[in-house]
Amino acid sequence: MIKLLYPEFWQKRNIIAYLLLPISLIYQFLGYLRASLARPIMLPAKVICVGNCSVGGTGKTQIVMYLAKLLRAKNVSFVIVTKAYGSNLKSATTIHQGHTALEVGDEGVILAKYGTVIATKNIKEILPLINELKPDIIIIDDFLQNPYFHKDFTIVSVDSQRLFGNGFLIPAGPLRQYPNKALDTADLIFLVSSTNDKIPNILTPYIDKLINAQIIPSSDVDKTKNYFAFSGIGNPERFFSTLKNYGLNITGYKIFPDHYNYLQADLENLYSLAKEHNATLITTRKDHIKFNDLNNNIVCLDVELSINNPDLLNEKIFKKAQIFN
């Protein structure tokens, strides 16, 4: 799997973005071809698909966690399906307590604390496991652009700072698809931020299905210490912003590629950097779980989703998905 950082030209167009446009056109054509030839299957349960239009972290994992807690509180049986990014997974599997991030993906390990999770790289492989588990609801993390299964309810997650970047498709820009169709057909749109940002103009036509959501800390961290932050997630800038908004003194930071699998040498280098800054290492839950087999003394900041209008979420999901029917 190719792991890339989010390049600057994905946010603001420059000569590199324009030079890559011909490849983006090929990407667009292949996407249209794939969609036109696909014959979507009907999964044996209602499907809630959480996805985004662009590469990089937009808060999908936190949205799935929120949905899982909501359904569990309503005593609704559900299964989460996750894409197993950054793992060596060969076939679809139900995650158990002993699985590692390298085996099933970092997101799968985290989400398994909230319910039954199937990790897969091919959506078609989940059917036997779904038939065995017999859930009422299937929450699918990502796969928004996958045309091979029917979606009953779609949630599009949008990062409030990056939005849709420079507006170009991969690799000239960050977009997996142009946002117009995704936003028009979405049942809900989550505008995710680390602060209470204003609604951007591009989303004002969708105000009736827009939910403002904030990523907020859910664990206590000693605010008297200095911290050196690092992360290998899709949107590290939002993590660093969350740390500062929480009132932590961040003396430095290091960014790794998304879904990065850390080595002992990386850990030693990070400890050296922290010592230079007279600081304690701090990172995300997605990164922290990858140090299970390495001696470490790294602080983990857990985060969760806070939304401004939960009634809209409840009304839309329980009405459209017809959970109790």
UniProtKB/Swiss-Prot annotation:
Keywords: ATP-binding, Kinase, Lipid A biosynthesis, Lipid biosynthesis, Lipid metabolism, Nucleotide-binding, Transferase. ATP binds at S54, V55, G56, G57, T58, G59, K60, T61. Its EC number is 2.7.1.130. Pathway: Glycolipid biosynthesis; lipid IV(A) biosynthesis; lipid IV(A) from (3R)-3-hydroxytetradecanoyl-[acyl-carrier-protein] and UDP-N-acetyl-alpha-D-glucosamine: step 6/6. One of its GO terms (cellular component) is plasma membrane. It comes from the Bacteria. InterPro entries: LpxK (IPR003758), P-loop_NTPase (IPR027417). It catalyses: a lipid A disaccharide + ATP = a lipid IVA + ADP + H(+). The keyword Nucleotide-binding applies. The keyword Kinase applies. One of its GO terms (biological process) is lipid A biosynthetic process. GO terms for molecular function: ATP binding; tetraacyldisaccharide 4'-kinase activity. Belongs to the LpxK family. Transfers the gamma-phosphate of ATP to the 4'-position of a tetraacyldisaccharide 1-phosphate intermediate (termed DS-1-P) to form tetraacyldisaccharide 1,4'-bis-phosphate (lipid IVA). This is Tetraacyldisaccharide 4'-kinase. It comes from Rickettsia felis (strain ATCC VR-1525 / URRWXCal2).
